[in-house]
Every structure is written in C-alpha cells, then in structure tokens.
Amino acid sequence: MKSPVSDLAPSDGEEGSDRTPLLQRAPRAEPAPVCCSARYNLAFLSFFGFFVLYSLRVNLSVALVDMVDSNTTAKDNRTSYECAEHSAPIKVLHNQTGKKYRWDAETQGWILGSFFYGYIITQIPGGYVASRSGGKLLLGFGIFATAIFTLFTPLAADFGVGALVALRALEGLGEGVTYPAMHAMWSSWAPPLERSKLLSISYAGAQLGTVVSLPLSGVICYYMNWTYVFYFFGIVGIIWFILWICLVSDTPETHKTITPYEKEYILSSLKNQLSSQKSVPWIPMLKSLPLWAIVVAHFSYNWTFYTLLTLLPTYMKEVLRFNIQENGFLSAVPYLGCWLCMILSGQAADNLRARWNFSTLWVRRVFSLIGMIGPAIFLVAAGFIGCDYSLAVAFLTISTTLGGFCSSGFSINHLDIAPSYAGILLGITNTFATIPGMIGPIIARSLTPENTIGEWQTVFCIAAAINVFGAIFFTLFAKGEVQNWAISDHQGHRN
C-alpha cells in the first residue's frame, strides 16, 4: 500500500533520493532486538562519555567565579539598570577556604577561551586517525587525558595564568579528537535506519552533562571549595575510561559478546555503503558541495550555541538581573530542554524514514530547518520583549530546546554522504564550527559595552541571521545518499 506521505518525499528517480550510487542497495534486514544489544550498549556508554566530556569542559565556568577575588571583578561590573532587580539580593555564605586570584575580566576571558585553541587543532587529525585505526582508543584516551589535565587545574592555577591557559589548551587538544572518533565508530556500528536514534543518544550526553555539571559545580564550591570541582569530575572521567576500555569494541566483528544475529544485521545493513579504498579521496571530498553544506550549517548553528553557552549567564545576571541562585538554575534549564529534544527527535527521524518512507534527505533538511530557524525566531523574540522575565526565560529555553532537532539533521549527515570517512568529515566541519566558539563571544562582548537591551538585541539578531543563512544553505545543497567518491576510486561524483 502506498504511504500517504510518499508524495512528499523524493521518488526513486529524483536526485534527492537515498539510493546508493553505482552499487545496488542491500536488502533491508529485520532489526535486531534493542534490549541488551551491543550497539545500544555503545550508545549509552558514549552518552556517559559525552556527559563527562562536557562536565570537564564547563566546570571551570562555575569554579572561576569562586577562584577570582571579588574585589578584582567589582570594577568590571557592567550591570544594566533598564530592568528592575528580579528579586532581593541574597547574601551567599559559603566555604572560603579556596585560594583566590586577582584576575581581571580580560584574563578570565583568556582562561576560558584557551580551550578552543587546542580543540581546533586536533579535529581533522583525530578524524583521520580514527578512520585508519578505529575510534575506541582515540576517544577513550581523549577523555582520559582531559580528565588527568583537569586534576592538575588547581596546581596550574598556583603556577600562574600562563600555566592555566596552557593546561586548558591541552584539555582542548584531548577533547578535539572525541567527536570525529565517535563518528568514525558509528560508521561501523549504526545501521542506516537507526543512525538518528543511536547518534542522538550518544551526543545528548553533552547536553545533560552541561545541565548537571553547572549546578553541581556550584554545590561543590558552596559546601567545600573550588578545587574539589576539578578533583571530582577528573576522577569520574577516569572511572568512565576504565569502563569504556573494558566494554567497547571498534567494530561488530571484534566485539566479544555481540550476538551473531545482531552482527549480521549491522553488517548487512551497511553493505555497499563502506569504501574499500586505502587512501582518502581528499580532492573529491573537498570539492563536494554536500560537505560544504554541512560546514556552513555547523558553523552557523555553533555561532548561536557558543554565544549562549558562554554569555547566557551574563545576560541573566547583568540585563535581567536574576540573583546568583536563580541564574545558575535558569542557565541550565535550556540545555535540559535541548537534551530531551535530541532524544525525541532521534526517535522521530528514524520512524519517519523506516515507517513512513520519508527520504533521508527530506528528514535531514526538515530537522535542520526546525533546529535552526526555530531558535532564530525565539532568540530574536527574547531580545525584543524587554524586561518581561518570564517570557525572556521561556523564549531562550524554547530557542535552545529547538536546536536539539539538528542532532538528527546536519549533525549526522556526514554518515549519510560518506560513512567510511565520517570521522574525517566531522573533523573538517567541526574545525570550522569551533571558530564561533573563539570569536563569537568576543564579538558579542564588544557589541554590549553597557549591557543594554538594545545592544543585546543586536547580538541576538546577528546570531539569528547567521542561523537562518546556514539553514537555507544546507537545505539547498545537502544530499542524503552516499556520494560516488566515498565508495569507489571513481573521481567524479554528484553534488
């Protein structure tokens, strides 16, 4: 019986179909059970891996508040008084045993931003190594190294700003290989019609890690002192590493406890999608317009993501004037929404493809449009509703939540167009997508010298415009099928 939505998806003869070029599509196998399966065990272990990863990344944002002498930061106070104070100031009494440092706002900016200078370097090398040697050890040791460096943060702070900046850059080097390595592993583990579910579960750990680590770091600072923030998350990272090394394999063929049926299901579903080339087709890859569609979308999405990740607490405090307890909670809520959206959108995307016969390209386009234009609309709205606290928080939460749709959009399109080189492709796109983390907050701060509502409207409008441009570019030039250059030595390929 013809699907009632089949007319909405590209037909077999259309350019946007999901047909594998040159080779015949493998027959669709009956999915192996989900319960206790090796592929879902990998998804949940990687979920906790990215939970740890983002906990290690963002904990400094909270600890830094307790590390810096309040007398040093008082002169940098740029609170806007356009909005009335949301509630009476609360005198926060907490443990004062942690050492204090006299770092001004510019120095703190260098400390927080130094992470990205290491992070951007290892993206492409990480993808290349993972595609050649597998992603298990690379991802595991990337997080393990970051955890070890995190344990040395208090010592580096005592040595001085230079040592702490260098340590944060080393943490960035370690984390830079993780996403490309994970993509490379999923190229061997994720059946095409389960990619959205499996990858959204994996990467959703990053959002939940942000939600949990921000308030938890505050609690640790409150009851103990800031040094224990780094000791706690560093030890958690080491424990995860031990579990990862013991329980995970690079491929279904090398997994010790996978059932024969599940292994055959995965291998048969990936038949004719993986390349037998020994060399990486760099030239055709870099000339591929579908790859650059992902680059533009990834860059655009991250501009908004990193701007909010680093400056949302500032907006809550200096413009909306929430107190520190409210700020910590409300800054984490949007990422809880994003986490839920990632999980649910992954289920929805694969159901649309498997049960309703929507094409991969259609799903990737629509989910990217929702996940980029939706946040743009609500981000602009948040800037223009003035001092309405409830609406401002609601719009910022909705904006960040809708961004979760992108986890089943452009974020995993690398696996659709070139599964054999997915790690390398993610390394390329994430290299460009790291740039907003380096320059976006700097530009935003330069546009908000007085922290007025009008200045923040400009920041939000710029981010929204970049998001919309990225969504349109991806919609026009993305593809949903494996490209010719990714499966053979054939030098020509369709764009």
From Swiss-Prot:
| Tissue/organ expression | Significantly expressed in lung endothelial cells, and much less in liver.
Q: Which reaction does it catalyse?
A: N-acetylneuraminate(in) + H(+)(in) = N-acetylneuraminate(out) + H(+)(out); D-glucuronate(out) + H(+)(out) = D-glucuronate(in) + H(+)(in); 2 nitrate(out) + H(+)(out) = 2 nitrate(in) + H(+)(in); L-aspartate(out) = L-aspartate(in)
Q: What's this protein's name?
A: Sialin
Say which domain of life the source belongs to: Eukaryota
Gene Ontology annotations of biological process type: monoatomic anion transport
UniProt GO cellular component terms: apical plasma membrane; basolateral plasma membrane; lysosomal membrane; synaptic vesicle membrane
**Glycan-modified residues:** N71, N77, N95
